[in-house]
């Protein structure tokens, strides 16, 4: 059975390591995601030592690395909660990987319909791991298998799985844009823009090397090389202006850029352990005009 791609395992590891290593209060509590990864998967991702211990340390470069995954996930959860209060009850996660929102946020899921879109083999593996852990699949969750290389429309795929095209949604694409072409991202945004007003897309993007803070450049180099070694080279980089222009051109009216400084001020200010997000990854939030 095919497993998840190893970059998704790394993201899950980063979220879990925050709880295991960093001081409370924790920005996000997600240890389930790393429990999904069995020992074989963790070894393949070079995250399990020969003695069976997780390869996790409190040193600053690794701490900043995991803060990236923590901040992006928390921002998404806050946005989903905010939009749910405004009546948006559909959540679509593109390239869901080891995402555990549906299993963890039981305070919100009774009011949501969640569609996880990912490769068929990844979803089959995830179902098996949830069953092995005794974790029930929530009634609100629909797995939507999609071969992203096939050219099939993810909008059509979620509609076939029960998505209501007459109601707005939150569309999440985190940790994806660096792996796909500008044309592919443009297509994704245009497809999202065919949905009804009130729909919001939240996506991460990677800055060009020249815009990275000097102290983060070595971490950036190591992270990029590790992704390439796992078979997922980074091919696309964007300035904030680039990404906002793409969203506007696709049809979004309300677009905003969430910087590393914004994330640090919102989630990491005043922490005793000094945890903070590095400068390489930023976020775009784009909403179609009109209220849900």
Short names for language-model regions:
Residues 1-92, 98-144, 151-152, 165:
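Rossmann-like AdoMet
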Residues 5-6, 214-292:
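Rossmann-like AdoMet/SAM-dependent catalytic core
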Residues 31, 149-150, 177-179, 207-211:
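Short, catalytically relevant binding-site loops at active-site mouths
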Residues 89, 199, 253:
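Short acidic/polar active-site loop segments enriched in Thr and Asp
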Residues 141-143, 153-156, 179-192:
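A short, conserved alpha-helix within the catalytic core of class I
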Residues 158, 163-184:
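A short SAM/SAH-binding and catalytic strip from SAM-dependent methyltransferases
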Residues 170, 189-210:
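Conserved beta-strand signature within the Rossmann-like core of class I S-adenosyl-L-methionine
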